Amino acid sequence: MKTVLITAFEPFEGEAINPSWEAVKDLHQREVGGVRVVACRLSCVFDLSLDQLYRAIAEWQPEVVIAVGQAGGRADISVERVAININDARIADNRGNQPIDTPVVEKGPAAYFSTLPVKALVQALHVAGIPASVSQTAGTFVCNHVMYGLLHQLHQQGDVVRGGFVHIPYSPEQAARHPGEPSMPTPLVTAALEVMIKQLLVQQVDVAITGGALH
């Protein structure tokens, strides 16, 4: 049976939970659309997170890797288009590291595009009634670090495995502590991930629909 690896993060910046892991952990060792899903929780730490990711890829030998992370303030499922080769941490990670203007990979290319059909995934989520959009930036913190490191590793291995990154909003419990911020219930995020997994099984090439932004 084919395997899809989904990663998520531990809590950071004083939060009690990370909604990415709350949504992802329920999929571990489940069958979705005829594939086995395995989940891995990453540390919110520069470099260590990539070590953990690479070990999980080596252990599970997946056909697809979907990394998931929290983006407090976003209102929908954000399917990331691109990762850039820069670490520029506005806050420290969970071990106190705060790199500024350092590369994720020394002498690596400036950026990598997701190898997932990002627009098709967003379209599938819309059909399922789940708010979603294409995002043009994964930030410059550990999420972008993981996305870039993932795509670099997969490229080094011949781009046989597809990979990308998805940002999700706060959970309602978190939003209650951040007045005015949007949220999405954890079961809906889990359902969104299932929709994306099923779409990936039938969609290799992206669809030609707009997913751009004016700013």
UniProtKB/Swiss-Prot annotation:
<feature type="active site">
    <location>
        <position position="143"/>
    </location>
</feature>
<feature type="active site">
    <location>
        <position position="167"/>
    </location>
</feature>
<comment type="subunit">
    <text>Homotetramer.</text>
</comment>
<dbReference type="InterPro" id="IPR033694">
    <property type="entry name" value="PGPEP1_Cys_AS"/>
</dbReference>
<dbReference type="InterPro" id="IPR036440">
    <property type="entry name" value="Peptidase_C15-like_sf"/>
</dbReference>
<comment type="similarity">
    <text>Belongs to the peptidase C15 family.</text>
</comment>
<dbReference type="GO" id="GO:0005829">
    <property type="term" value="C:cytosol"/>
</dbReference>
<protein>
    <recommendedName>
        <fullName>Pyrrolidone-carboxylate peptidase</fullName>
        <ecNumber>3.4.19.3</ecNumber>
    </recommendedName>
</protein>
<dbReference type="GO" id="GO:0016920">
    <property type="term" value="F:pyroglutamyl-peptidase activity"/>
</dbReference>
<keyword id="KW-0645">Protease</keyword>
<keyword id="KW-0963">Cytoplasm</keyword>
<dbReference type="InterPro" id="IPR016125">
    <property type="entry name" value="Peptidase_C15-like"/>
</dbReference>
<keyword id="KW-0788">Thiol protease</keyword>
<dbReference type="Pfam" id="PF01470">
    <property type="entry name" value="Peptidase_C15"/>
</dbReference>
<dbReference type="InterPro" id="IPR000816">
    <property type="entry name" value="Peptidase_C15"/>
</dbReference>
<comment type="function">
    <text>Removes 5-oxoproline from various penultimate amino acid residues except L-proline.</text>
</comment>
<keyword id="KW-0378">Hydrolase</keyword>
<dbReference type="InterPro" id="IPR029762">
    <property type="entry name" value="PGP-I_bact-type"/>
</dbReference>
<dbReference type="InterPro" id="IPR033693">
    <property type="entry name" value="PGPEP1_Glu_AS"/>
</dbReference>
<dbReference type="GO" id="GO:0006508">
    <property type="term" value="P:proteolysis"/>
</dbReference>
<feature type="active site">
    <location>
        <position position="80"/>
    </location>
</feature>
